[in-house]
Regions:
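Compositionally biased terminal segments of proteins
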Residues: 1-266
Length: 266
């Protein structure tokens, strides 16, 4: 579901303040697709340092107020700030947060949003979020990612490189343990079209089955990586395939890195 006009207007104004240390992240990065299941109900701006967070929040607030928006600060902490931004009867939340600089790819320039977290970093973060808090929005987002970006199994495998406290199996089990939602919860989300939670559950259980089968096939010593093809695109690895050894094992690093020719192969 594409971003709403109100959110787009805010993001357009804030794009001038974005840079590699202050960038758009969260679900906004992939929910702006026309085929996404829902519309994001807040705007997340991530930062690698506390200093950049504090500076960006002040700069963004000034830009919005200069353009006729009203800001109500509802949470102001050293590592996190949240404001409700409103104008002409419409409102949304903007959140400025500190986040680890450890990621798979560098923050990338974006014609609409200024600078954004790489979608695959956003996707692995989303899987970790689902296992950590189990929100319905995370559940639906992970289903969308599984069907359109990269499989649950491949994302969970890579996500463990960002949190050594998880194994891929444990990560998926925690997500599965929390994935129980009453139909009434759908009313809290801005959906592109009506969703059937029974059908979603079937898709989820199939994704979990496929993920566990994949974990049993992959070399344990490679946990925490994305598998990239010759075009540097993330793929679902197939260990039984003759092409598996040719896939690049791409690991996370501080501020991320683009794959290089010298990156090790299997």
């Amino acid at each position: 579901m594409p971003l709403g006009a109100f959110e787009k207007s805010i993001l357009r104004l804030l794009s001038v303040n974005r840079n590699p240390e202050s960038y758009i992240a969260g679900a906004t990065v992939f929910l702006r697709r026309e085929d996404s299941l829902r519309q994001s109900q807040d705007i997340d701006v991530f930062h690698d340092t506390v200093k950049s967070l504090q500076s960006a929040a002040l700069l963004d607030a000034a830009v919005l107020e200069q353009n006729g928006y009203v800001l109500e600060w509802v949470d102001q902490q050293e590592l996190f700030r949240r404001a409700v931004v409103s104008r002409a009867g419409q409102a949304t939340k903007v959140e400025w947060a500190y986040d680890s600089a450890f990621r798979f790819f560098p923050v990338q320039a974006d014609a609409e949003l200024g600078f954004v977290l790489h979608p695959l970093d956003g996707a692995t973060n989303k899987v970790l979020a689902l296992a950590g808090r189990g929100e319905l929005r995370d559940y639906l987002d992970v289903l969308f990612l599984h069907q359109n970006i990269l499989s649950l199994g491949a994302l969970a495998w890579a996500a463990c490189g960002k949190d050594a406290g998880f194994t891929p199996q444990f990560l998926v089990e925690e997500a599965q343990r929390l994935a129980h939602y009453p139909a009434s919860r759908l009313n809290t989300l801005l959906l592109r079209e009506p969703l059937d939670l029974v059908q979603c559950k079937r898709q989820w259980l199939q994704a979990v089955t496929e993920a566990k089968a994949l974990f049993n096939q992959l070399p344990p010593e490679e946990v925490g990586c994305l598998y990239l093809d010759a075009n540097h695109q993330a793929v679902i690895p197939s260990p039984a395939s003759s092409e598996f050894s040719q896939l690049r094992r791409h690991h996370g690093s501080v501020r991320g890195a683009w794959p290089s020719i010298s990156e090790s192969l299997g």
